């Protein structure tokens, strides 16, 4: 613990960056706007036609920020006609979004400088940082076959927005910037709303993507820290299947308080954490802890994770957010797949001289299947089929041209095959393909006021078949039975293929986003 405190103080001395003056620079907001337009997910400014950037409004924003006692009066008298004027929807939305995007860029500057200028240290070695979704595929194919139990964790959202601000106090030693963030969140959510509400999360993610990602990633890094710290202290073996987590200065105080409440708990905890085959991976607000230990060990892990997170963040973590599964007896949801590790029995007849006998061989196989019921339900909600999977026409698309209708149906079908190309069985995909193809034919027939048979005879089935089965030439990662990895540019293959660009269409994981 003394080593941890010394390391934390050393890191704290490097974080004296003052970013508040940058908020008054016009180029920061211009850069935020350009980044939003050129990024993969553009920033939508309400009230601005064609997303045009208004430098006049930004200058007006900076002038008002320079006014004496502006922030104090804004907090004490929020109903006055100040920066965020509720009576003028355009100015209110514009200022809130452009300020949040600019603030998101400014607070990332000290973190980037710390990563670039951090000297080499030998006191606490850094762990391998696997920040790419592509590292999940080798983890699935290689590690899961040798593990027994899995803990599926849903990372909880913080109860109060103040917790998100407090998490930044360690890395950003700039009080005015933190006060500005508090004021902005106070305006945006009235400071009394819970971030756990779907409305607050949706608004933050939709209108303030950069700021929301920064706050959420900071929170997740702190949430993961105590897991890595305990795991590192419990064993001399390094945890290589995880990411790099950030330290915080108040952890030692939390541990001392926890030790007073539960004497002797820490020493017992360390013993139960000594599993050298513990693997960790995080994705899309969820995490997985897989190990080769016993069920008792996994239950201990669950209990300690709940208790430590409660005292670490000062809010209650629901135990049902951590589910225990035995890999050989149950399936688990992972990146939109239903995954499992079944045991396949293979009988081999062995002939030795005049005697023959049977050898019962058991082999584990990592199996990934496509969840049929959720995807059919998503297509039903998007009005492509009924609840039982019977294809129907989509009336809202009949006003489009024939090419647009074919393009929309074909894009959905190709994305489904593209994303679920890592599935072991393709029967569900062919069923979805049948639903979309017949729904497309019914939509076109309804548009031309014809029957499906007549329209298909005129259009030709060959065109639809070729349209739905064409594959783009993308970079893929294929695992063979000999544990060798092949990188190639190709289309459809009989082997299980993980395409490296599926992160761009990961909305397919959420069935509600298909429409």
UniProtKB/Swiss-Prot annotation:
<dbReference type="Pfam" id="PF01824">
    <property type="entry name" value="MatK_N"/>
</dbReference>
<dbReference type="GO" id="GO:0008380">
    <property type="term" value="P:RNA splicing"/>
</dbReference>
<dbReference type="GO" id="GO:0009507">
    <property type="term" value="C:chloroplast"/>
</dbReference>
<dbReference type="GO" id="GO:0008033">
    <property type="term" value="P:tRNA processing"/>
</dbReference>
<keyword id="KW-0819">tRNA processing</keyword>
<dbReference type="InterPro" id="IPR024937">
    <property type="entry name" value="Domain_X"/>
</dbReference>
<keyword id="KW-0150">Chloroplast</keyword>
<protein>
    <recommendedName>
        <fullName>Maturase K</fullName>
    </recommendedName>
</protein>
<keyword id="KW-0507">mRNA processing</keyword>
<keyword id="KW-0934">Plastid</keyword>
<dbReference type="Pfam" id="PF01348">
    <property type="entry name" value="Intron_maturas2"/>
</dbReference>
<keyword id="KW-0694">RNA-binding</keyword>
<dbReference type="InterPro" id="IPR002866">
    <property type="entry name" value="Maturase_MatK"/>
</dbReference>
<dbReference type="GO" id="GO:0006397">
    <property type="term" value="P:mRNA processing"/>
</dbReference>
<dbReference type="InterPro" id="IPR024942">
    <property type="entry name" value="Maturase_MatK_N"/>
</dbReference>
<comment type="function">
    <text>Usually encoded in the trnK tRNA gene intron. Probably assists in splicing its own and other chloroplast group II introns.</text>
</comment>
<dbReference type="GO" id="GO:0003723">
    <property type="term" value="F:RNA binding"/>
</dbReference>
<comment type="similarity">
    <text>Belongs to the intron maturase 2 family. MatK subfamily.</text>
</comment>
